[in-house]
Amino acid sequence: MAELPKDYLSYVESGESDFGFTEGEPGYFQLWALEEREALHRDYKVDEFAPGFIGFGSNGGGELLAFDSSGAVFMIPFIGDGVNDAKKIANAWSEVVSRITDE
């Protein structure tokens, strides 16, 4: 399985919140625990419906949060046409972090 981007790993390992709200997309995020990520990636069949992406959480509204090979962040509906419905929401995890709000 491909590696998670360094900025994402730094965020998670620093003890920052594993859920929160953002201005703009994703609006809300819930990150998968690192020790559960590979199992959840398999359980959600990410390799089957979104090949080339690394699942790492959801927006709480039926969409997977995933990285592509460049580290860009995408939202992909759990029900739909997989990669054809993938929507790029940030060039990197740090861009999502910059949008985190208190509400």
Model-derived segments and spans:
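Catalytic Cys-His active-site segments of thiol-dependent hydrolases/isopeptidases
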Residues: 75-80
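A surface-exposed partner-binding patch
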Residues: 1-65, 101-103
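Short acidic-glycine loop/turn motifs at beta-strand connectors
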Residues: 68-71
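Compact, glycine/acidic-enriched structural inserts
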Residues: 82-103
